[in-house]
Amino acid sequence: MPGNGVRGLAGRSRAWAGTRTTAILSVVKMSSTVEWTVHVCLTLACAPPGTLMQAGALAEFHGLPKAYLTKQLQALVKSGIMRSTPGVRGGFSLARPSSEITLMDIVAAVEGRADLFQCAEIRKSGVIAESGLSNVNLPCIVQIEMTKAEMAWRKALAAQTLDGLARRLEKGAPRVVDLTRQWISAI
């Protein structure tokens, strides 16, 4: 009967691996809010310095719902990425130079800074734990590698500034930048 146990274990391992892979990939997935806020910040980075844009204009420019975008803009204000100027002629602007605002700043403002991977220490249960072969006194190798990968991801986002993105956009798609500036000057 050992063969049946091994086959059963192998089947569970494959099922676990598929589920775990899906869970890991879904954790790394960012919300559409990140895309929206990066594009909005990039729009302001391409605008003339000191440009104020109302939430409705930003929402219209990007084809986004104003109410939801306004909520995200407030998160950017709270984190010091944007400034909100009240009044009829008020609006939103970048609070710092675009060279000082990173993609990681924006992601953290809208998604938070919590670790992406949360180790549930499943190695403390199941067949290996029951066998006594699992040394839970050592750090979890999965946790170590996932943390290293997350740190590399955060470092890569922290290395990308809005200014760098704006310069790349201007070089690669100058007509998009021109249209953006024309649209802003017309409002």
What are these regions (language model features)?
Residues 63-83:
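Canonical helix-turn-helix DNA-binding module
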Residues 22-40:
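Short alpha-helical segments that sit at the start of domains
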Residues 52-63:
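A short alpha-helical element within helix-turn-helix/winged-helix DNA-binding domains
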Residues 2-4, 12-25, 119-187:
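C-terminal regulatory/oligomerization modules of transcriptional regulators
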Residues 40-47, 109:
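Short amphipathic alpha-helical elements of helix-turn-helix/winged-helix folds
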Residues 45-50, 96-97:
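Short helix-capping/hinge SLiMs at alpha-helix to coil transitions
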Residues 81-89, 93-95:
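Beta-hairpin "wing" of winged helix-turn-helix
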